[in-house]
């Protein structure tokens, strides 16, 4: 992992205007009969794995024909080994004076190598480096070395005339090149299909690209397995439009006088739609606000939708129900700040709400000495289908959904959860406000009153009205 590797020919980021402290060249001598002066460089540290190197009186370098130019780049241990060393050569064609000049560059570690007058190589015995060349036909050459070895790197530049594979020393032609060298965390900041992340393995700190949408490579530039634009658009639309399944539950909740529940469903539908529009990899992305805010609101809305639906099914007293709604919102917000992607963030509140529901129904069944809700139609056509749909959605979310099938499994999850709400949300209590004449004529005495709507599971135990059927 610490061995040098070259890759890519992408444009490099601009240079900063400020300079840092100079680095002294090591003065290493190549295994030849010549000694070359090594030109020092300036080091400007900007951030983690972000260093720019400059030469004195640069960035343009004049290369006389009689000798090469050698530059030393010092990479510090730990601080520089986890990034990408980038180098760019650009030939100034106006300085050639119609000479057929080619400028060669040889980048080696610890020991500079000589570039001969005829055969141009960048290796000798057990030492090998990276060779670059620029000419009138190819004026720009780029080199990138991820995770470079620390120590001193030597760049040797030499101008030769003629046409390959054999060259000769130029007689009276001074070439001018522009040299740029810097260290960056990732290759081109990973481009539009990746994200540069700072990672740590044991005590080793390094930066790497996390590619999306099937893109691969050091800089997320390998499109061999990349998703097409049409596929990205399809997945985005499917994830966003599947949230429209919350419209029927919103309408049903409003018709049933569950205004607070309808507001929660609307909140969930809105933020889930725009969160998935912002969460997509690649170029099919639309963000109306910060990604972290959208993610938090989407997760909170999803959990609150489950919470308010189950609490509404318990048919508690209004004060108790409002307290549980507020308490659930605060506890769910805290849980999401701790871990947004934990499975228990979904199962925990759901199981707790189901416990409240089971307790309320059990107490009501014991008091009335029959099952609650009492009608088999409510169980057969609403509760059982709704529970089956909601359980299927949880199983898909917990055990089936992966990164590869996310876009359609999660879309199904949206539709199943929204569909289950339409079955599980209890209906509105229909009470008759007309007062019978006999109700006012009765005096004191004991009466056993049975509210038909309450027995059908349509009103709470505190909802008895004067329209109840009373038996002395």
From Swiss-Prot:
Extracellular side: 1-233, 278-292, 337-342, 401-405
GO biological process, one term: cell adhesion
Domain called EGF-like: residue spans: 182-221
Main location: membrane
Disordered: annotated span: 1-24
Membrane topology designation: Multi-pass membrane protein
Cellular component annotations (GO), alphabetically ordered: endoplasmic reticulum; mitochondrion; nucleus; plasma membrane
Transmembrane segments: 234-254, 258-277, 293-313, 316-336, 343-363, 380-400, 406-426
Classification via InterPro entries: EGF-like_dom (IPR000742), NGX6/PGAP6/MYMK (IPR021910)
One Pfam family from the record: DUF3522
Annotated glycan sites: 100
Biased composition regions of type Low complexity, renumbered to the chain: 1-10
Keyword annotations: Cell adhesion, Cell membrane, Cytoplasm, Disulfide bond, EGF-like domain, Endoplasmic reticulum, Glycoprotein, Growth regulation, Membrane, Mitochondrion, Nucleus, Transmembrane, Transmembrane helix
Disulphide-bridged cysteine pairs: 186-196, 190-209, 211-220
Places the protein is found: Cell membrane; Cytoplasm; Nucleus; Mitochondrion
Membrane-side (Cytoplasmic) residue stretches: 255-257, 314-315, 364-379, 427-472
Modified how: N-glycosylated.
Subunit structure: May interact with EZR.
Function summary: May function as a regulator of the EGFR pathway. Probable tumor suppressor which may function in cell growth, proliferation and adhesion.
Family recorded in the similarity comment: Belongs to the TMEM8 family.
Protein name stated in the entry: Transmembrane protein 8B
């Amino acid at each position: 992992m610490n061995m040098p590797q070259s890759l890519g020919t992408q444009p490099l980021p601009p240079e900063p205007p400020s300079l840092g402290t100079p680095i002294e060249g090591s003065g290493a001598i190549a295994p030849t009969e010549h000694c070359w002066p090594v030109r020092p460089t300036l080091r400007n540290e900007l951030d983690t794995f972000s260093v720019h190197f400059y030469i004195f009186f640069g960035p343009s370098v004049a290369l006389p024909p009689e000798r090469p130019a050698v530059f030393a780049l010092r990479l510090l241990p730990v601080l520089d080994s986890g990034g990408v060393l980038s180098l760019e050569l650009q030939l100034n064609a106006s300085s050639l004076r119609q000479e057929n000049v080619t400028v060669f560059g040889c980048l080696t570690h610890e020991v500079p190598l000589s570039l001969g007058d005829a055969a141009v190589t960048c290796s000798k015995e057990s030492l090998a480096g990276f060779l670059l060349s620029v000419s009138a036909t190819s004026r720009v050459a780029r080199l990138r070395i991820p995770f470079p070895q620390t120590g001193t790197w030597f760049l040797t530049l030499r101008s030769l005339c003629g046409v390959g594979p054999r060259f000769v020393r130029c007689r009276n032609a001074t070439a001018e090149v522009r040299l740029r060298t810097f260290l960056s965390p990732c290759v081109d900041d990973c481009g539009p299909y990746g994200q540069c992340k700072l990672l740590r393995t044991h005590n080793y700190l390094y930066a790497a690209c996390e590619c999306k949408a099937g893109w691969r490579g050091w800089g997320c530039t390998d499109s061999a397995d990349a998703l097409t634009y049409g596929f990205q658009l399809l997945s985005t639309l499917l994830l966003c439009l599947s949230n429209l399944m919350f419209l029927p539950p919103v309408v049903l909740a409003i018709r049933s006088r569950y205004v607070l529940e309808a507001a929660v469903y609307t909140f969930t539908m809105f933020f889930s739609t725009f969160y998935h529009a912002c969460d997509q990899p690649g170029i099919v992305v639309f963000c109306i606000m910060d990604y972290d805010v959208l993610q938090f609101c989407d997760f909170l809305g999803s959990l609150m939708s489950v919470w308010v639906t189950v609490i509404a099914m318990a048919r508690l007293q209004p004060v108790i129900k409002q307290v549980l709604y507020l308490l659930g919102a605060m506890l769910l917000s805290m849980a999401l700040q701790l871990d947004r992607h934990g499975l228990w963030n979904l199962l925990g509140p759901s199981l707790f709400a189901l416990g409240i529901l089971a307790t309320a129904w059990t107490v009501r069944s014991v008091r009335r000495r029959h099952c609650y809700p009492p009608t088999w139609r409510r169980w057969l056509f609403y509760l059982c289908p709704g529970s089956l749909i909601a359980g299927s959605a949880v199983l898909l979310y917990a055990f089936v959904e992966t990164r590869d099938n996310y876009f359609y499994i999660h879309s199904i999850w949206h539709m199943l959860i929204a569909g289950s709400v339409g079955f599980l949300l209890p209906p509105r209590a229909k009470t008759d406000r007309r007062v019978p004449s006999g109700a006012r004529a009765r005096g004191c005495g004991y009466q056993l009153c049975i509210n038909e709507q309450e027995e059908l599971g349509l009103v709470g135990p505190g909802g008895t009205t004067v329209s109840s059927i009373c038996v002395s």
